């Protein structure tokens, strides 16, 4: 199992952070096998103690509801506890990963 799998499997809550098109570097970091993914990232404190990244389009706080084994992968299902939309970010376009590259919606 990977570092990321163990982090998700052993936690009560997790967060989904919706990045904007100028934040591909964060997506690349968290998609890597590095174990220091959270180093030098600014976070927002919150009641569920989940890693909400500062200056993202939106953050979704989830309870770790279920983990389903699917072949050699696992699917984590979260029960949404809270959604935050950041109206103060300057770039409003979400970062999309499609066709092995990062893109923006047009």
Give each language-model segment a name:
Residues 1-106:
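Basic, polyanion-binding surface patches
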């Amino acid at each position: 199992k990977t570092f990321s799998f163990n982090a998700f499997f052993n936690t009560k809550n997790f967060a989904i952070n919706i990045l904007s098109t100028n934040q591909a570097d964060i997506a690349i970091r968290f998609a890597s096998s590095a174990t220091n993914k959270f180093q030098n990232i600014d976070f927002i404190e919150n009641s569920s103690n989940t890693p909400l990244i500062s200056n993202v389009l939106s953050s979704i706080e989830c309870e770790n509801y279920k983990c389903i084994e699917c072949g050699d992968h696992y699917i984590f299902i979260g029960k949404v506890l809270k959604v935050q939309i950041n109206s103060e970010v300057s770039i409003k376009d979400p970062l999309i990963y499609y066709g092995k590259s990062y893109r923006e919606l047009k």
